[in-house]
């Protein structure tokens, strides 16, 4: 697991925004939502922005998280999506 201090800084459950930056591919948003659904089922409407040159997409999704471990698991799983460069 990651060594974060989310449990010291936040009260759970809470809405937590994840920003996933990856290669511009039409399925990136669907893959992000699929990973989130696996760990936090719900109805999600992520926002997507393309980079200035169109090479990358930024997908922002707000997820209700229940613990530090929940956040860390989502960070890890989202980072493992093919084509993802960063998870913020």
UniProtKB/Swiss-Prot annotation:
InterPro entries: UPF0250_YbeD-like (IPR007454), YbeD-like_sf (IPR027471)
Stored Pfam families: DUF493
Organism domain of life: Bacteria
One GO CC term on file: cytosol
Disulfide bonding pattern of the chain: none
Similarity annotation: Belongs to the UPF0250 family.
The name this protein goes by in its record: UPF0250 protein SO_1163
Organism: Shewanella oneidensis (strain ATCC 700550 / JCM 31522 / CIP 106686 / LMG 19005 / NCIMB 14063 / MR-1)
């Amino acid at each position: 697991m990651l060594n974060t201090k989310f449990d010291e800084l936040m009260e759970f459950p809470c809405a937590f925004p994840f920003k996933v930056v990856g290669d511009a591919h039409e399925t990136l948003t669907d893959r992000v939502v699929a990973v989130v659904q696996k760990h936090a089922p719900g109805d999600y409407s992520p926002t997507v922005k393309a980079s200035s040159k169109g090479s990358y997409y930024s997908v922002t999704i707000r997820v209700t998280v229940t613990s530090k471990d929940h956040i860390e698991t989502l960070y890890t799983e989202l980072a493992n999506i093919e084509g993802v460069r960063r998870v913020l």
